[in-house]
Amino acid sequence: MSLEVILQLGSILLVVAAGPLVIVLLSVNEGNL
């Protein structure tokens, strides 16, 4: 495992995890307002 591969996998995981989190946060904020 090279450092570049680890960085690429990490960035992909961050994007995949950030997608649903952003949607949930937006829905929660709209619900509270």
From Swiss-Prot:
Location of the protein in the cell: Plastid, Chloroplast thylakoid membrane
Gene Ontology biological process terms, A to Z: photosynthesis
The protein's assembly and partners: PSII is composed of 1 copy each of membrane proteins PsbA, PsbB, PsbC, PsbD, PsbE, PsbF, PsbH, PsbI, PsbJ, PsbK, PsbL, PsbM, PsbT, PsbX, PsbY, PsbZ, Psb30/Ycf12, peripheral proteins of the oxygen-evolving complex and a large number of cofactors. It forms dimeric complexes.
Organism: Oltmannsiellopsis viridis
Protein name: Photosystem II reaction center protein Psb30
Any Gene Ontology CC annotation: photosystem II
Main localisation: plastid
Family per record: Belongs to the Psb30/Ycf12 family.
Membrane topology: Single-pass membrane protein
